[in-house]
């Protein structure tokens, strides 16, 4: 008996939701790992080993080939190098949702886009209003981002009570937020531009597009090209993590081999396996090799790369980023400084206010559609979680602020993340409790 007949048939919707649910499961677990990494960094930064711990991340590291050498601090390699993979995976997820997921509908995609714009504009405006022209005014980009892993981790604690429409809305919003933030970093917080290096990087992207059109599908080739483009952007003055965003959005979302062709190739292998007396062994092995290629290429490049990279990003790169950036000597800090207060208010108040306002305007102006399962009260409660800017906010803060301002800034980010997580969790718990349904 065919074993597949004993299983439920797969519906087309399963092809869309299965990768999405796998993404959520990984992100939920990653949120816990991120929290533990943050606590570890905070603990070590406030012990007798504080100086050694903080100095470790400033150690230079690099490679030299003849007269050419590339040396950066360990923190730089993490923040600019490894975090490129984070943004690459984020861009892959966005591309898949826009091409294959629910966001294929332009009006459905417009809602998280509008919400993300509000979630960036309102906190930046509040921050500038509170800081004025004082120290740290140029750091307005810090309050514009959302920590995807922590937001999904908070939703995971509520389990299945949270509707899928809210999960998708917040995930899409966080992705648009992060991409918007990295674009602002690339433009607003870069160094003076080296146009030769920038042009070289642009030619690299053109080359990648060209070999993709020629049908070259070798991931090592694209990795080598991506590395070369990253080096060019690192030398150009534009923040090199932008390379991850662009390459992620350039990655094909369609598979090369259809299911019909895959089944035909596999049927040929099954009918004439290697060693079968009715087929020549060389031809059968050629068919077997073709089946291996077809099996791999029946999965889209986006999904293959997500499967390969997401665990590394979620369980290695992001925790390493948190450990290297979240070390804040509490004894040297002062929560009462205006900068800290401005960051807390911008995240806790500005984020949800901007998201709700822009979402409401987009729906009322018929620019966007709101899913029926996503009530305004749920949207507002979920938006409270977007004040968790933690890892992304720390990432931008390292670029936007002078070193002497980083301690109060990091405390503001940490305080805002804790407050936003508590408020969002309590609001969603009340709204999704069985007594209210």
From Swiss-Prot:
Residue spans crossing the bilayer: 29-49, 74-94, 111-131, 139-159, 168-188, 196-216, 229-249, 307-327, 341-361, 376-396, 411-431
Catalytic activity entry: Na(+)(in) + 2 H(+)(out) = Na(+)(out) + 2 H(+)(in)
Any single GO CC term annotated in Swiss-Prot or TrEMBL for this entry: plasma membrane
Chief place of localization: membrane
Subcellular location: Cell inner membrane
Sample GO molecular function, one term: sodium:proton antiporter activity
Presence of the UniProt keyword Lipoprotein in the record: no
Protein's GO biological process: regulation of pH
Keyword Nucleotide-binding found: no
InterPro entries: Na/H_antiporter_dom_sf, NhaA
Keyword entries, A-Z: Antiport, Cell inner membrane, Cell membrane, Ion transport, Membrane, Plasmid, Sodium, Sodium transport, Transmembrane, Transmembrane helix, Transport
Topology class, membrane: Multi-pass membrane protein
HAMAP family the record matches: NhaA (MF_01844)
Family, per entry: Belongs to the NhaA Na(+)/H(+) (TC 2.A.33) antiporter family.
Stored NCBIfam families: NhaA (TIGR00773)
Summary of the function given for this chain in its UniProt record: Na(+)/H(+) antiporter that extrudes sodium in exchange for external protons.
Protein known as: Na(+)/H(+) antiporter NhaA
């Amino acid at each position: 008996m065919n074993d597949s007949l004993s299983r439920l048939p797969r519906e087309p919707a399963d092809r869309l939701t299965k990768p999405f649910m796998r993404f959520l499961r990984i992100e939920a677990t990653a949120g816990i790992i991120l929290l533990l990494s943050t606590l570890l960094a905070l603990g070590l930064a406030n012990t007798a080993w504080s100086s050694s711990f903080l100095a470790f991340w400033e150690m230079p590291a690099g490679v030299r080939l003849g007269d050419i050498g590339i040396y950066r601090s360990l923190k730089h390699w993490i923040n600019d190098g490894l975090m490129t993979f984070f943004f690459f995976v984020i861009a892959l997820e966005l591309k898949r949702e826009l091409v294959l997921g629910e966001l294929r509908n332009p009006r459905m995609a417009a809602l998280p886009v509008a919400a993300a714009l509000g979630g960036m504009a309102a906190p930046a405006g509040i921050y500038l209003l509170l800081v004025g022209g004082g120290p740290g005014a140029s750091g307005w980009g810090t309050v514009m981002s959302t920590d995807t892993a922590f937001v999904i981790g908070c939703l995971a604690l509520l389990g299945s009570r949270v509707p899928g429409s809210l999960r998708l809305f917040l995930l899409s919003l966080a992705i648009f937020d992060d991409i918007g933030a990295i674009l602002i970093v690339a433009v607003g917080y870069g160094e003076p531009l080296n146009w030769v290096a920038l042009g070289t990087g642009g030619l690299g992207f053109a080359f990648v597009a060209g070999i993709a059109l020629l049908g070259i599908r070798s991931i090592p080739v694209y990795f080598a090209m991506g590395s070369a483009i990253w080096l060019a952007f690192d030398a150009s003055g534009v923040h090199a993590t932008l390379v991850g965003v662009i390459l992620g959005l350039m990655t094909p979302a369609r598979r090369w081999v259809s299911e019909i062709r895959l089944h035909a190739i596999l049927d040929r292998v099954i009918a004439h396996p290697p060693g079968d007396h009715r087929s020549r062994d060389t031809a059968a092995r050629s068919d077997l090799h073709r089946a291996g290629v077809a099996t791999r290429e029946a999965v889209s490049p986006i999904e293959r790369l997500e499967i390969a990279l997401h665990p590394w990003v979620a369980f290695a790169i992001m925790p390493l980023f948190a450990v290297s950036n979240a070390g804040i000597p509490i004894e040297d800090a002062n929560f009462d400084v205006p900068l800290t207060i401005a960051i807390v208010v911008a995240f806790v108040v500005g984020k949800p206010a901007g998201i709700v306002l822009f979402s409401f305007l987009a729906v009322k102006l018929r620019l966007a559609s709101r899913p029926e399962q996503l009530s305004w009260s749920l949207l507002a409660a979920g938006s409270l979680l977007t004040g968790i800017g933690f890892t992304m906010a720390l990432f931008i803060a390292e670029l936007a602020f002078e070193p002497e301002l980083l301690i109060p800034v990091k405390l503001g980010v940490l305080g805002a993340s804790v407050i936003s997580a508590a408020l969002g969790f309590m609001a969603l718990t009340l709204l999704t409790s069985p007594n209210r349904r």
